[in-house]
Amino acid sequence: MRNLKFYICVLLALAILAGCATTKFDVVSKPGTDLTKCDNFLVCSNIEDAVFKADLESRFVDKLTANGKKAVEGTKAKSDSGSDYILDVKLLSSSIKLDHKKIGPAFPVSFKLEIGESHEVTEKVTMSFDISVTDTKTNEMIFRGTVTSDSEESTEAGCVNAIFSSVASNTVKKYFVK
């Protein structure tokens, strides 16, 4: 019974860790630019899939508004949104890597022969984004960066969900709020 509790704790810890995404930044910005002082954003994305596009834009809007900024999704905005800045999130690349791991015999065998084996397949999705901020008054790009994030989940949708959350959350936290 003690071993069962231990294994359950280990499985829960692995489940929590598996839902994480790592995010890396590489940015340049106009000298003197402080995005923490910017407000009122129009968030746009170039993703063709309407569901993913709306999801990514809404993640940034949610994170910005939760941190006291005004923001509207490009998919919901009219042609003149009245925004002071345009936050443009473009998908540069995405890739999926499948890992195939042997996790042991499929059933207990009393001999040294392994009659059946159990395997686990995990997906690692990596996505890179170009993120830019343009001042609508001067039509000048004041910030531009590349963000790369990856995640390992049991499904592609789970990976994309973790990546979108990580990219939006980490970008807003790192550059848009103090």
Region annotations inferred by a language model:
Residues 15, 36, 81:
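Structured loop/turn residues at beta-strand edges in well-structured enzyme cores
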Residues 1-20:
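Sec-dependent bacterial lipoprotein signal peptides
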Residues 2, 77-80:
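A general structural signal for short secondary-structure junctions and capping/turn motifs
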Residues 80-141:
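Surface-exposed short loop/turn segments
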Residues 20-36, 118-178:
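C-terminal/domain-edge helix-coil "capping" segments
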Residues 19-76, 176-178:
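A structural "domain/chain start" motif
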Residues 48-50, 92-96, 149-152:
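Solvent-exposed loop/turn segments at secondary-structure junctions
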